[in-house]
């Protein structure tokens, strides 16, 4: 009898997820954006396959990283595609978020955010 693992080890690090909020001056002018963290998740970096590029709809460039995390119950009610992810000090946009058949794991397809010139 073969024992199935209870959970997969997600030990590549922790990612921070959240939203970008616009900061405004007292006059109401936009002065920039700041990342507001909603939480942290342990992740494992996954390899990208051709089917991942087709599913996301990005054929040549744009898909930088695919990560696997546990599926928190709080994620069932939010739009995961509008999230921003901060990993190792690098900000990423979530292109697509997909779950497995058991809704135990969540896969984030990430594109590195473009830095604005300051």
Show the residue positions of the predicted features:
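Active-site-proximal polar cores
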Residues: 1-33
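Short, conserved turn/kink motifs that form compact alpha/beta structural patches or helix kinks used as
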Residues: 2, 30-118
């Amino acid at each position: 009898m073969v024992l199935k693992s209870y959970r997969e080890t997600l030990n590549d690090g922790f990612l921070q997820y959240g939203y970008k909020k616009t900061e405004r001056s007292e006059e109401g002018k936009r002065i920039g954006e700041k990342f507001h963290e909603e939480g942290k998740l342990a992740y494992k970096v996954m390899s990208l396959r051709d089917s991942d590029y087709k599913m996301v709809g990005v054929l040549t460039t744009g898909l930088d990283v695919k990560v696997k995390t546990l599926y928190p119950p709080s994620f069932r009610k939010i739009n995961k595609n509008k999230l921003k992810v901060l990993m190792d000090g690098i900000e990423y946009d979530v292109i697509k978020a997909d779950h497995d058949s058991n809704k135990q794991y969540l896969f984030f397809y990430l594109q590195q955010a473009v830095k604005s010139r300051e």
